[in-house]
Swiss-Prot record:
InterPro entries on file: SAM-dependent_MTases_sf, UbiG_MeTrfase
Binding site residues for S-adenosyl-L-methionine: 36, 60, 81, 123
EC number: 2.1.1.222, 2.1.1.64
Gene name in the database record: ubiG
NCBIfam families: UbiG
Record protein name field: Ubiquinone biosynthesis O-methyltransferase
EC primary class: transferase
Length: 252
């Protein structure tokens, strides 16, 4: 079953040339990108002693906002996206900046089943796919044993609707109107339920919040709007656990 949402693809295809315009439709991603990269690298280093030969997969890579900085840090990155125009934009940027990244136009379903990676990354993608459950199960299938995945998305709360849609799209104009569909936002507990009876452990939940007084973004324990989730594929466990995460236990 495909996770492609054709309406979402059409929406992003119209602006796919503008990924690297810091003042354009993806400007908000540029403003939070240093936090995203720092978080990813922190999780990688906490899981691996030797990071020199790690294989990283970036799913739904867009124009390469995650793949490019990681490649610049010396990581071996494969990045996939369903949109040809996104891959073209990402490839052009990589070539101009001398970055070696294996870009592929592909969905997670089209990736060969035996292709496994030490780190699988999927940021701000889940809320745009057609079948969230199948997408997540396909995603974690490509993690090597004892490897990790880092995903981020938006929580389905009243607070997320207020700040993620009303404020971000209609008041501040951080992202184009109709970028998000509230019904596609995902509660952490729903991801936990999807991963039940798998060998995937949820290691951490971390929120990303905007401090209006300081005009800056920061990591937080507040997961009501944006959140990161770090997963680990265990060798022997057959049941997903929440690793004692209080925010997750509270909403299950």
């Amino acid at each position: 079953m495909s996770s492609i949402n054709k309406k979402e693809l059409e929406k992003f295809e119209k602006i796919s040339h503008n990924w690297w315009n810091k003042n354009g439709e993806f400007g908000i991603l540029h403003r939070i990108n240093h936090i995203r990269i720092e978080y990813i690298i922190e999780k990688i280093k906490s899981n691996y002693n030797d990071i020199s030969k790690l294989q990283i997969l970036d799913v739904g890579c867009g124009g390469g906002l995650i793949a490019a900085p990681l490649a610049l840090q010396g990581f071996n990155v494969t990045a996939i996206d369903a949109l040809k125009s996104n891959v073209e934009t990402a490839t052009i940027y990589a070539q101009k900046n001398g970055l070696k990244i294996n870009y592929l136009q592909a969905t997670i379903e089209e990736l060969e089943n035996d292709k496994l990676y030490d780190v699988v990354i999927c940021l701000e993608v889940i809320e745009h796919v057609a079948n969230i459950q199948q997408f997540i199960l396909n995603l974690v299938q490509h993690i090597k044993p004892n490897g990790i995945a880092i995903i981020s998305t938006m929580n389905r709360t009243k607070k997320a609707y207020l700040f993620g849609i009303i404020v971000a799209e209609y008041i501040l104009g951080w992202v184009p109107k109709n970028t998000h569909d509230y019904s596609k936002f995902v509660k952490p507990s729903e991801i936990y339920e999807i991963l039940t009876d798998t060998n995937i452990e949820i290691k951490e939940l971390k929120g990303l919040v905007f401090n209006l007084a300081k005009n800056e973004w920061k990591l937080s324990n507040d997961i009501d709007v944006n959140y990161f989730m770090c997963l680990e594929k265990k060798m022997n466990s057959l049941s997903s656990t929440c690793n004692g995460i209080p925010q997750l236990k509270r909403v299950i």
